[in-house]
């Protein structure tokens, strides 16, 4: 880690020619100055203190019933927990592949480093409310996720066929998911514990993953994949 919670390779939003905000990547930090590169090839610099990555978490959920005041879900419960600890959850309930692609794109362009997927899963698929999405389709919808950590509570997606393909295809910094079937109650518990370690204790995603796995080895059986 360099700077104040900034990493080389972080995706940030930075002004260019004082006109607009453009997505950029930190390339080097020195003497309190951040150097960054835009997608169109332009480069710029500015004080690192103006380029703080957000504590946003993109929460994308798809279950059989849309959460309400009387019906709670893992994703909605996680969102309330994140607010309690000072993070900024961006919750979206989806039903279709098209909606999944839309919100993955928003997450990809965001300064957020974290994406959370709350839905059913199979060996090589995410199961949405109205359709199933194969891992290859998920990769195509997600695009370039370098600099992002993706936590999935979807059953069975922590197997090699899904996890290794996902990080290889998207370039995500990490993909964390249960290898076996997991109850929603356990999914809610381990996801909250993971983000508590991440945001409150300031540890890395891998350290948070190891902590959760050691605490609940049988209930979660989480796997950690990286490129």
Locations of the language-model features?
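Short acidic, S/G/P-rich loop/turn micro-motifs used as interaction or catalytic elements
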Residues: 64-69, 97-99, 121-125, 156-159, ...
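Catalytic cores of nucleophile-dependent amide-cleaving enzymes
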Residues: 128-191
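Active-site proximal helix-loop segment of RNase H-like, two-metal nucleases, encompassing DDE(D)
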Residues: 189-202
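Mixed-charge, Lys/Arg-rich low-complexity intrinsically disordered regions
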Residues: 1-8
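Active-site microenvironments of hydrolase-like enzyme catalytic domains
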Residues: 113-126, 169-174
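Caspase-like cysteine protease fold
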Residues: 53, 57, 131-142, 200-227
């Amino acid at each position: 880690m360099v700077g104040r919670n900034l990493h080389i390779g972080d995706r940030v939003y930075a002004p260019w020619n004082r006109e607009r905000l453009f997505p950029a990547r930190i390339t080097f930090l020195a003497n309190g100055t951040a150097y960054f590169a835009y997608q169109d090839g332009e480069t710029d610099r500015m004080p690192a203190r103006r380029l703080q990555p957000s504590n946003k978490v993109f929460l994308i959920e798809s279950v059989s019933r849309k959460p309400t005041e009387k019906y709670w879900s893992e994703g909605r419960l996680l969102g309330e927990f994140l607010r309690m600890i000072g993070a900024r959850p961006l919750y979206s309930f989806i039903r279709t592949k098209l909606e999944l692609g839309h919100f993955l794109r928003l997450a990809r362009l965001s300064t957020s480093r974290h994406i959370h997927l709350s839905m059913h899963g199979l060996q090589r698929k995410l199961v949405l409310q109205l359709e199933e999405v194969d891992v290859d389709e998920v990769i195509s919808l997600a695009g370039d996720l370098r600099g992002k950590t993706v936590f999935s509570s979807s059953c069975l997606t922590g197997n090699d066929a899904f996890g290794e393909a996902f990080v290889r295809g998207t370039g995500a910094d990490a993909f964390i998911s249960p290898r076996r079937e997991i109850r929603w109650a356990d999914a809610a518990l381990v996801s909250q514990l993971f983000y508590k370690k991440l945001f409150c204790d300031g540890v890395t995603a891998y350290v948070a993953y190891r902590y959760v796995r050691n605490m609940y080895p049988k209930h979660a059986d989480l796997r950690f994949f990286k490129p």
